[in-house]
Amino acid sequence: MVVVAVAGGTGGVGRTVLDAIAKSGQHQAIVLSRTTSVPTAVDEPKRFAVDYNSVEQMKKILQENNVQVVVSALLLVDEAVAQSQINLIRAAAQSGTVTKFIPSEYYIDFHAPIPYVSLQSILSRQRFSLFSTSGADLFTNFQLEAEAELSRHAQLTWTLIRVGIFLDHLTMPHNPKTTYITPFWVFVDIDHEQCVFPGDGSQPLVLTHSQDLAAYIERLVGLPAENWPRESVVASNKLLVKDLESLVNKVTGKKFKVAYDSVECIHKGRITQLPSNTAVFQDPAKGEMFRDVEHQVMLSMLSRAHDLPGKNLAELFPEVETTDIEDFFRSGWTLKQSRAP
């Protein structure tokens, strides 16, 4: 039995990973969080309040619990969180017990150049990054910083996991599978029967449910370090963006209102807003962040960032059943209809 520490275990990805570990019954998990709380169920993992500014304190927690694998599910939205992950990597490397580390990626290839982004536009915006605009030095990239830090610690085996966009977003708020992913609408607004796609829709797209990612992480935890790929891919569904329009029509039997935003409009941040995102963008705490997320997602689609390099984990773990996009969308649509007044 492997002891796994999940950092950010109270967030969307972290909770999903903990569910997968609990379901398998093969490993023991603990949660690293900024705050601690008493488990409400007997089988809930222990939670440890950590000071992400203290490498020494985190190292001690990892040692005392004989942690062998660390899974980071921290949401890298600013410099402070990015530094928290760097410190966690250092604590793991110094612990003497941790041998494997999964950093927070779970999206695209962060080395891929993202076109149509000028230095001026970057400098005029808040320093918030989900991906690199150049793979270089237009501004520091949090994921690349973590990768560089991991490369300094030969005692750690690590893998970068790329999954594309979470399929969970496609049917929100009608979720046919359990999801803890924060409500946010990407490409399709099922309630308002609207879609918005980038450019001509000919870009490659990967959509993976959060439960699929978690299932593969659970398998990786038990895999010997020598068999870990440096780059991993979970690609439950590979298609072109415009294929979503035909999928929606096929499943619903309706013609959704569809907008194809031009490259120029996306570049300038003039993106057709899906109605369900109105409340999201008005959130005083996270609204601006989600506007940035929307812009960056659309920009990333204009590149080849969804041509994900790495070892397909389906080849390593063929027993994992992944979520088919058509079945998922049909179930979500059926759920929506069942809730209609």
From Swiss-Prot:
Similarity comment: family membership: Belongs to the NmrA-type oxidoreductase family. Isoflavone reductase subfamily.
Enzyme class, UniProt record, top EC level: oxidoreductase
Name of the featured protein: Oxidoreductase swnN
Role played: Oxidoreductase; part of the gene cluster that mediates the biosynthesis of swainsonine (SW), a cytotoxic fungal alkaloid and a potential cancer therapy drug. Swainsonine production occurs via a multibranched pathway and is dispensable for fungal colonization of plants and infection of insect hosts. The first step of swainsonine biosynthesis is the production of the precursor pipecolic acid (PA) via conversion of L-lysine (Lys) to 1-piperideine-6-carboxylate (P6C) by the aminotransferase swnA, the latter being further reduced to PA by the reductase swnR.
One Pfam family named in its UniProt record: NAD_binding_10
A molecular function (GO) term: oxidoreductase activity
Top-level taxonomy: Eukaryota, Fungi, Dikarya, Ascomycota, Pezizomycotina
Pathway: Mycotoxin biosynthesis
Entry EC no(s): 1.3.1.-
Organism field: Metarhizium robertsii (strain ARSEF 23 / ATCC MYA-3075)
